[in-house]
Amino acid sequence: MSGGDLTCPIVFRGINGVCASVGAQHTQCFASWYGSVPGLKVVSPWNVEDCRGLIKAAIRDDDPVVVLENEMMYGVEFDAPAHVMDKDFVIEIGKAKIEREGTDVTIVAHAKMVGRSLEAAEVL
């Protein structure tokens, strides 16, 4: 609306998707709802690399960013490669991340379902 003349650097973090020990009305996915808002960037990390890189990128972004976290991923341990711990490590918002390359099928997922997709890729 401002033609790029104004910035709104703010980060919103929130739980999204299926959760443990809550009613069905509390386990909805807001990714498409937020994603349909013009100018609002939405990220949904899966592993430690995504969390660190995307949250740092969100904090540095001049536009509003929503970070959608799956509660069931809290407490899940991932190995952190050395490059992830580098102080300059960030993941570019808006660019797809390829977790596993293949030649027969493309599987697209976000958040918790990335893990399930990688399992499915092994079977396929």
Model regions and ranges:
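Conserved thiamine diphosphate
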Residues: M1-R116
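Short helix-loop-beta junction
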Residues: R116-L124
